[in-house]
Curated annotation (Swiss-Prot):
Residues 1-38, 249-287 are annotated as: Disordered. Pathway: Protein modification; protein ubiquitination. PANTHER family: UBIQUITIN LIGASE SPECIFICITY FACTOR/HREP PROTEIN, UBIQUITIN-BINDING SDF UBIQUITIN LIGASE COMPLEX SUBUNIT. Component of the SCF(sconB) E3 ubiquitin ligase complex involved in the regulation of sulfur metabolite repression, probably by mediating the inactivation or degradation of the metR transcription factor. Belongs to the WD repeat MET30/SCONB/SCON-2 family. Component of the SCF(sconB) E3 ubiquitin ligase complex. The gene is sconB. Residues 27-38 have a biased composition (Polar residues). The keyword Metal-binding does not apply. Residues 163-209 form the F-box domain. This is Probable E3 ubiquitin ligase complex SCF subunit sconB. Keywords: Repeat, Transcription, Transcription regulation, Ubl conjugation pathway, WD repeat. Pfam families: F-box-like, WD40.
Amino acid sequence: MSSPPPFTSIFGGPAESAEEIDADADNSQLKPHNRSNVTATSAKLVGKSVAPFLAKHVPDQYAPLGSQNREPAALSSANSRYCYRHRPDRKCRRQADEPTMDKLQRELESLPQSDQQGIAHVWSLFSAAPAKHRKLILQGIMAQCCFPQLSFISTTVRDLIRIDFIAALPPEISFKILCYLDTTSLCKAAQVSRRWRALADDDVVWHRMCEQHIHRKCKKCGWGLPLLDRKRLRESKREIEIRATTWDVNGTSPKATPALPEDASPVADSSGTGKRKPEPSEEETAVVKRHCQSLAMRPEGSEDYFKTRYRPWKEVYKDRFKVGTNWKYGRCSIRIFKGHTNGVMCLQFEDNILATGSYDATIKIWDTDTGQEIRTLRGHESGIRCLQFDDTKLISGSMDGSVKVWNWRTGDCISTYTGHRGGVIGLHFDATILASASVDKTVKIWNFEDKSTCLLRGHTDWVNAVRVDTASRTVFSASDDCTVRLWDLDTKSCIRTFHGHVGQVQQVVPLPREFEFEEHDVECENDNLSTVSGDTEPASLQATLGLESNAVISQSSPFGPSFESGRTAPPRYIVTSALDSTIRLWETSTGRCLRTFFGHLEGVWALAADTLRIVSGAEDRMIKIWDPRTGKCERTFTGHSGPVTCIGLGDSRFATGSEDCEVRMYSFQS
């Protein structure tokens, strides 16, 4: 049996036997003066063994001058290829760790000169070796390692094999990866390094985050955030307009008066008289001056004057996230407005203006920032049941049967409309269309563009609420006859009736078109079906057809032939409240009741909704916040000593009015 070949040392020569090693040890003890000679001899041998290896694999640095012309095959050898971790043209090539290399250098310098030279030769061999040779060297070294050494290798390698992929990849791919992270993970990623922070805080990532969460519920995490404060958007718009009007094309500032803010600009009378509004008051002029003072502080020749100041999307998300968290946990401040002498029946707020109507026949305008009453509008002879205002006008409806148009900034009554034979309970205007609901069981449509009016008949009891959708030219109405109707303004007919409530329906609110309802969340209630105005066929059949009994079945539109030619469809979802103590979510195209909200102990008088939540107020003096997708009651507020009769909803606050003569505003702004 042949003996095994001797093990080859890492320096290229055969390893010495055990006897030879012992003999050398004895000789070294007897002849210590020969150690320097042995070291010098070993260094020469090592140099002769290492130099050819280095010259072969690193010819540019170690090959002699006379051997420059090497064979092309040797240059393109598979063993001389770089691995992907050591490609000089790759960004993922790992850089030296400065603290580790400093420690390594200090430990190396603590060794004798001969040991330093031997270790350096080993490093040189490994550094010059191609990928295949490196693997062989590593396998041989690890085969001789004991467990403590293998444990050291395992611990060290765990950190070395990590690659900074964010820094290595192109920014576009890094942004794509970061867009999959949630808010918490993004904030942690920004703490890794400066490079990670620059990418994790970039507007590309946070704009995507805002798109997923603001004004809608994220499908992945279920988190939704309110819109940006409209007041900030308007102030930014006004500043841009003022800056544009005070500079000409040559960059010089003319002696011109800045443009008035949007809420102080003169407008035409909504009644169609064509008269201009009066000149702005001292208060309105002061608003303009405040906007101009901020511009006057900047030098006229500075570039900053022309630059639009953008707010980083991360700050936008941060601001909205705080508001959304306050909504979730019910953290809010409350301001109470007192001044009416009878129950508050209607209200609306916008920016810092709050308008309230009461059974004391007055309308009060409040400053929400200070809580002070600005002015009182008087003119109605009976209780005020409904109102709505915009930047230029306020329209109110009263139990005296009249509709009045006011200049709420001055308190002047511009015009009065009478057309109902009973009190006006509800109204809503959009653009040039005004719809009013009355105790005379009708809905009246007022068109201020062509000065025309029409009556929509079909309800058999008081009509409590109306909503106009200008885009689809339709109107929703809710009545004490326990139904909700959808009307076509072009044909002046009812195209769908929603049945399901067993109490008088008090409110109907179309949800924004951005609202999305998952199909798996649907609670189909087959006993709540819609019909059409004919009512000549069974409810189940009419709900299946989705059309009038004498109409031709339309395959393209569930709302009838008039919606087949590309006409905008009505809002897809509506919510209603009734005195049966329930709130219902409906799909308008099919008439199905998708969800019923239970929780109030008595009839629900007030209702407001957006894409994130539903707010309701009831006879039980409670206000409830609902998730429209799950039907869960997220929060209940108390405080009123009388039934809650009206609600106004904003992105970061809501207001409630009650028969206790008080108005409460809940602000979730951080």
